[in-house]
Amino acid sequence: MKHMLISHRGNIDGKTLLENQPSYIDDAIDLGYDVEIDIWYIGDKLYLGHDLAQYQIDLNWLEERKSKLWIHCKNHPALELMCETDLHYFWHDEDDVTITSKGIIWAHPKIRPLKKSIAVLPEDTIGLWMIVWVYVRII
């Protein structure tokens, strides 16, 4: 098993109003983090944003960073679009777990992490802020 940290929406040291902004995500990537991002697809345009579509991006932006992104599709059109790509994406609402497009278990923060899963926001129990711990099996 391997531990790794994934920045949650670009956050690495607490929640800020900058989360999901493209330059903020790039800052986290530049520091060596993978980043979980939230995307929306509305009117043939892609956006970053958690509760609503805020920052317009395009597929090239995602492609240029694809080795570092964990893409959370926030609406059904975003999920349908991602299914046409080789990007690493997932969808969940209130499900206990979901499976990413790369076959990794993504556990909802409301449940105890599973072995070999991504434990989302474990700081609720261990005191870390806005970081996602990942347990990935190395083959």
What residues fall within each predicted segment?
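Phosphate-group recognition and catalysis centered on beta-loop-alpha active-site segments
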Residues: 1-139
